Amino acid sequence: MDKINSQRKKLIIAITLLIIIILGLGITYAWLIQIVNGEKIQSMRVGTFRFSLTEENSLTINSGEFLKDSDGLKQEGFKFTVQNVGKGYGSYSVYLDDDSISSGQTRIDDKFIRYSLGINADTTGTPTNLTSRKIYSGGLDASEKDTFVLRLWLNPAVNGDIGGQVFKVKLRIEANQQIPTPVADKLLAGVGNNGTIDTTDPEQTFITGTDPNNYIWYSGKLWRAVSIDPSDNSVKLVTQWNISSIPYNADGNTAFQGSYMEQWLNDTSVDGFLGNLREPDKFIKTDSVWNATSTTETTKPAKTTMVTDAVGLLNVYEYTMSNKNAIDFTGYLNNDLYWWTLTPYSTSNVRNVYDHGNVNNCSPTISRGSRPSINLKSAVKIIDGDGTVDNPYRLQGDNDSPTGALLSTRYSGEYISFGTGENNLYRIVSHENGTGTKITSAIPLKESSSYKSIKFGSNVTFTKDNTIGTFLNGDYLTSGTYLTSDQVNMIEDNTTWYLGTVGSGTNYKLAKYQDATSSSLTTSTTTAQIGLLRLGELMAGQFDIYGNNTDYWTLTPLDASGVRDVRGSGHVYDSSPTNSDGSRPSMNLKSTVKIVSGTGIKSDPFVISN
């Protein structure tokens, strides 16, 4: 009864409900219930945790009819409810899996299927191609429920003969329950075989080792837990990767307080780091005290220079402690990139970590990577994950699934399924234009598995008509090689790109503003649909080890003969515009773009639709 044929008769499709509840204890319970017709309620209880699923009516599809979205959305749909009637929080995901078909039958290719998933008040949902079998992820506190309406139809935009083919699926719900645990308690209970808890410092309990289970995902970024403050159980984090790369300060000024770096970290503007953190007053200690004392040693510094800020950097002692139970700088904080520490070495040099993991010092005018550090409040709790890189700890209140929400409500660093082939992952940068969402490719563009190199142009000024601008606003945008037509329609027609010059040792703000006060925008601008990131912009860093990445262009000139580029080792230098570098296309998506599914992490990026 599942065959698609030319008679255009209405068919009932069999939906198999596979409900899996996975507890934090690692025990899995599974039920397989075959639903064909009628009204049934299936309820699963494990201890005090239970999900209920109500099947209100069977799913129908018009056989042989390729429906417009407007007609597909008129279908009654398949209704079900997921409810947490236990006492604890539970996260869950909804999958649309292939069900078994009979011998001799042929399964319809997913490209022919469109679907919508209405959720709660949004009973309609957004028409979406079936490109991912995970169609929803979310979480429920005790007594909460989510009500869904699933509609499926054949996609009229796809040509092909599917006569006699079969579409048969099963609805799978995976649920996970963990008792919310304070971050400090979870870490102190153990960080895996490749890490150790070190209590030799009475003021900081350090996590040491080569690769402890201390990964945390928060506000669109992957962090490592570094230490616990025994006085209040707050937890110090640092980003795993370089979020950007800027000069530390002007020549001869190595103090953290008042530096370019302090400004960048604590910038609350629309494109600032702190301004793009999720609910900082809820998650982090905004009055954290940072030891920025100058020292030539790597041992614990005196408390000579203490700075109060929401965001800081790790000092050289904290980095050194991470290597305590490792050899040859193989500690977990060595990310094989160049990055700044908080610690001045002298009045002319600041401590930084090299790509091999050794500590060195250099002029503050040089652009090294920025790895922001924050202190989580003691009340923040872990709700999911196991602390590994593939399954980082998730924080209660930051573990939502914003299906149906506007992309413009989300956070810098979150991942988006966008683009095609090997260039199909992008990240949110900011909401610089106020209504839409600025995004950039997660890595420089690739071509046949290798990074694509391109000249900047004949001079240092980016326009849609110079070499790289012509490519970005031509072949990249229109050829179909890098973007689908639906994705192109999500992009704003025009964006203003800021082209301010940032000379050696000058403030990163000059890339966008006339001066360091940020009171007036630079007059050096251009208009184009697709551009690049500028020096110091969020996500203008490196997010893999040196050797797995490549150099790439920014928009920002150094002077009349050089353009700033982000090197594979994580620092910013400059290159002649006639040289070739990688490119990370950047653009503003329209304010109407919505999230269809996904949680925004690298392994489960947001799927979006206009």
State what each model feature region is:
Residues 180-610:
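Collagenous Gly-X-Y triple-helix signature in extracellular proteins
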Residues 67-70, 133, 163-164, 213, ...:
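Glycine-centered loop/turn motifs
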